[in-house]
Swiss-Prot record:
InterPro entries: PyrdxlP-dep_Trfase, PyrdxlP-dep_Trfase_major, SelA-like, SelA_trans. It catalyses: L-seryl-tRNA(Sec) + selenophosphate + H(+) = L-selenocysteinyl-tRNA(Sec) + phosphate. Keywords: Cytoplasm, Protein biosynthesis, Pyridoxal phosphate, Selenium, Transferase. HAMAP family: SelA. The modification N6-(pyridoxal phosphate)lysine is found at residue 292. This is L-seryl-tRNA(Sec) selenium transferase. One of its GO terms (cellular component) is cytoplasm. It is found in: Cytoplasm. The lineage of its organism: Bacteria, Bacillati, Bacillota, Clostridia, Eubacteriales. NCBIfam families: selA (TIGR00474).
C-alpha cells in the first residue's frame, strides 16, 4: 500500500504543466518549484510515517502551492481594527498619526528630502535642526534632541551627564516600563551608579539631601505613569528637588514618560504632569515619549538647558540612537498641531479619541447597530454602556465612559467568534466578557464599519 502511494505522487514537471504561465512569471519558476518540492516531500514523509493514506493529485498539489505562495506574499505587519477601547494600545501600534502627519511620512518616503542638507547655505546640515525649533517653541526649552525611544533617551542622558557618577532616585520610582525593561537596568547600561533613597511608599526631601556625596552626578525623578501607590504615601515634587539641587549645584533629570504637552484634565481626564510644567519647576533635562500621549511617531524626546543638551548631542551613542526621516516627518507635523490646542485635539487621533464626547460615541454605536441590521438572522446585537482606557502605560486610574456593541449568537460561541474576527483578513480585535463579544466604539474609525459588517456576514454564512 505504501509503495503504491509513493508511486502515485505526481512529478514536479507534471504539476508545473497545469500552472498558468502568468502565475509562474509572477512568483518566479524557481520559487514555485521549491514550494512544490516541499509539498510533495511533506506528503511523502506523511505516507512513510503512516499518517495519511493518500497521495496528492496534481491538482491538489497545485492548489496547496498557490495557497502557500499567496500566504508568503501577505504582509506580516497589517492593518487591524481596534475594537478594544484601549486608545494607546501598545500591542496594536500605540498612537495613530494624523492625516497630515501620514502624508508627510509618505512624501518623505517617496522623494528626496533635505534631511541633512542646509538649503540656505548649500551644504551639509543637521537632521535635528529640522525639528528642534518646533520643540523649543512648544515646550519653552532652551534646546532639544530626538532619539528612537524614551528608554534610549534616558539611557543617553544618564551616560552623557552621569557616567561613573552617582544618580539619586527614590525607591518608589524605580519602575518597570514594560517588557522587563527597568530603570535600574537602564541606569546600569548607562554606566551611572544608582543610589536608592526612601522607601517604596514614602520618600522625603531629606532622603535626597542625606544621599549627596562628592560623587553625586544628578537627581533623577521618574513619573510612575503606569501604576499608582495609594494610602500611606509621601513623595517629593520636582519643584522641591530642584530647589535643593540649585543649592547644591546638582542637575535634575526627569523622565515624565508619556509626553503630555497640554493639560488634559480640562477635558475630564486624569491630571498628568506636562513637559512645560516640568521645565518650569526647574528640571534641567526632561525626557518623554513621542508615540504615547503626545500622539506622534515612536521617539524619545529630550528637552532642557542648552549646556546639557549640547553635551548629550556630542555623545557617540547619539548617532547609534538617531531617528530616521520618517520619524522626523511624522513628529514635525504632529508637534505643529500643538501650536493650536484646538487643532491638536481635533486632528491628533489619540487626543481626539481620548476626549470624545459620550454623545458622539453613542451616535457611533447606533450607526454600527443600524448597519448590522441585515445580519440579525445570524446574531443578536445590543448597545451597552461601558468603559474605555487610555492605555500605553498612561493614566492607570482613568476610566472613560463609552458605548459598546454587544454581539451574541446561537450558532457560534463568544470564544470562537472572537477568534474568527481576530483571524479575519483585516483582523478585528474585540473584548470578550459576560459570555459575549463586545466592540468599543471609542476606537472605531470611519473605514472600519464596512469591514466589521463584511467580517460578521462572512462568519455568519459559514
Amino acid at each position: 500500500m505504501t509503495k503504491e502511494l509513493l508511486r502515485a505522487l505526481p512529478k514536479i514537471d507534471e504539476i508545473l504543466g497545469i500552472f498558468n504561465e502568468d502565475f509562474l512569471n509572477e512568483n518566479g519558476r524557481e520559487t514555485v518549484v521549491s514550494a512544490l518540492r516541499d509539498i510533495i516531500n511533506e506528503n511523502r514523509k506523511a505516507i512513510l510515517n503512516e499518517e495519511v493514506d493518500y497521495a496528492l493529485t496534481k491538482e491538489e498539489a497545485k492548489s496547496k502551492c498557490e495557497h502557500r505562495l499567496l500566504k508568503k506574499r501577505e504582509r506580516n505587519l497589517k492593518r487591524v481594527i481596534n475594537g478594544t477601547g484601549v486608545v494607546i494600545h501598545t500591542n496594536l501600534g500605540r498612537s495613530l498619526l494624523s492625516k497630515e502627519a501620514t502624508e508627510a511620512v509618505a512624501l518623505a518616503a517617496s522623494s528626496y528630502s533635505n534631511l541633512e542638507y542646509d538649503l540656505k547655505k548649500g551644504e551639509r546640515g543637521s537632521r535635528y535642526s529640522l525639528i528642534e525649533g518646533i520643540i523649543k517653541d512648544i515646550t519653552g526649552a532652551e534646546a532639544a534632541l530626538v532619539v528612537n525611544n524614551n528608554a534610549a533617551a534616558i539611557m543617553l542622558v544618564l551616560n552623557s551627564l552621569c557616567e561613573n557618577k552617582e544618580v539619586i532616585v527614590s525607591r518608589g520610582e524605580l519602575v518597570e516600563i514594560g517588557g522587563s525593561f527597568r530603570i535600574p537596568e537602564v541606569m546600569n547600561f548607562s554606566r551611572a551608579k544608582l543610589v536608592e533613597v526612601g522607601t517604596t511608599n514614602r520618600t522625603h526631601l531629606y532622603d535626597y539631601e542625606d544621599a549627596i556625596t562628592e560623587e553625586t552626578g544628578a537627581f533623577l525623578k521618574v513619573h510612575s505613569s503606569n501604576f499608582k501607590i495609594v494610602g500611606f504615601t509621601k513623595s517629593v515634587s520636582a519643584n522641591e528637588i530642584c530647589n535643593l539641587a540649585r543649592e547644591k549645584d546638582i542637575p535634575v533629570i526627569e523622565d515624565i514618560g508619556s509626553g503630555v504637552l497640554i493639560d488634559l484634565s480640562k477635558y475630564g481626564l486624569e491630571k498628568e504632569p506636562t513637559v512645560i510644567e516640568s521645565l518650569e519647576s526647574g528640571v534641567d533635562v526632561v525626557t518623554f515619549s513621542g508615540d504615547k500621549m503626545l500622539g506622534g511617531a515612536q521617539a524619545g524626546i529630550i528637552v532642557g538647558k542648552k549646556k546639557f543638551i549640547d553635551k548629550i548631542k556630542r555623545n557617540q551613542l547619539t548617532r547609534a540612537l538617531r531617528v530616521d526621516k520618517f520619524t522626523l516627518a511624522a513628529l514635525e507635523i504632529t508637534l505643529k498641531h500643538y501650536l493650536n490646542e484646538k487643532e491638536a485635539i481635533e486632528k491628533i487621533p489619540t487626543l481626539h479619541m481620548m476626549t470624545l464626547d459620550l454623545k458622539e460615541i453613542e451616535e457611533r454605536a447606533n450607526r454600527l447597530y443600524k448597519n448590522l441590521e441585515g445580519l440579525n438572522k445570524f446574531y443578536k446585537f445590543s448597545i451597552e454602556e461601558g468603559e474605555s482606557t487610555v492605555g500605553g502605560g498612561s493614566m492607570p486610574d482613568s476610566k472613560l465612559s463609552t458605548y459598546l456593541l454587544r454581539i451574541d449568537s446561537d450558532s457560534i460561541n463568544e470564544v470562537n467568534l472572537e477568534r474568527e474576527l481576530r483571524e479575519y483578513k483585516i483582523p478585528i480585535i474585540t473584548r470578550v466578557y459576560k459570555g459575549a463579544v463586545y466592540i468599543d466604539l471609542r476606537t472605531i474609525l470611519e473605514d472600519d464599519y464596512e469591514v466589521i459588517f463584511n467580517a460578521l456576514k462572512e462568519i455568519g454564512e459559514k
